[in-house]
Swiss-Prot record:
UniProt: S-adenosyl-L-methionine binding residues: T58, D79, N106, A107
Lineage summary: Bacteria, Bacillati, Bacillota, Bacilli, Bacillales
Keywords per UniProt: Menaquinone biosynthesis, Methyltransferase, S-adenosyl-L-methionine, Transferase
Pathway participation: Quinol/quinone metabolism; menaquinone biosynthesis; menaquinol from 1,4-dihydroxy-2-naphthoate: step 2/2
SUPFAM superfamilies, sorted: S-adenosyl-L-methionine-dependent methyltransferases
Organism of origin: Bacillus cereus (strain ATCC 10987 / NRS 248)
Protein name per the record: Demethylmenaquinone methyltransferase
Entry GO MF terms: demethylmenaquinone methyltransferase activity
PANTHER family: 2-METHOXY-6-POLYPRENYL-1,4-BENZOQUINOL METHYLASE, MITOCHONDRIAL, METHYLTRANSFERASE
Amino acid sequence: MQQSKEERVHDVFEKISDKYDVMNSVISFQRHKAWRKETMRIMDVKPGSKALDVCCGTADWTIALAEAVGEQGKVVGLDFSENMLSVGKQKVEALQLKQVELLHGNAMELPFEDNTFDYVTIGFGLRNVPDYMHVLKEMTRVVKPGGKVICLETSQPTMIGFRQGYILYFKYIMPLFGKLFAKSYKEYSWLQESASTFPGMKELANMFEKAGLERVQVKPFTFGVAAMHLGMKPESK
């Protein structure tokens, strides 16, 4: 029987959890850290605020958010892969970040009340969910009026020549890296599939607006290999 997208993604991340951080650095040539740092600068996270990191994986962005909100703030990381969360919990415990809570849950049904968080992020996770728009609407639902919804994700480069090289890299080279470093050719083939079919920057910006967000900002990284999208939930009338 053919697996659903949700089942396949779950299997992928359960299997690659122990090598995920290393492979992130290999695949992006360490650029993912710089992309996240610049995204955090643009977000301008306020101390004492409350944040949710959806599809938090091994909790790298969750930890960055926790450091930004400080001990008086609160950060919740949510992921549906228990193995990925297990890696994240080890990091959080090592850093003694008491303001962090990691939860096993589904991005399609966020287990929170409306208007709960000041910031809701999703990093390299939106392309893996069954329904992009549904998850964006869920993120918009749980963010407070005036709060920010942020997505950092792979994108579709538009520069001629570079785009072709990017496609070749993701289709042929990245799965080989997966086989070499993580013994997971099949799983990293899935990651290139999900990246290749993900909406481009303009299309995702339109989706942010359709989800109910305004003042949408788009920031491309490394010739459009990745991009940040940030939208604000309208203030209550």
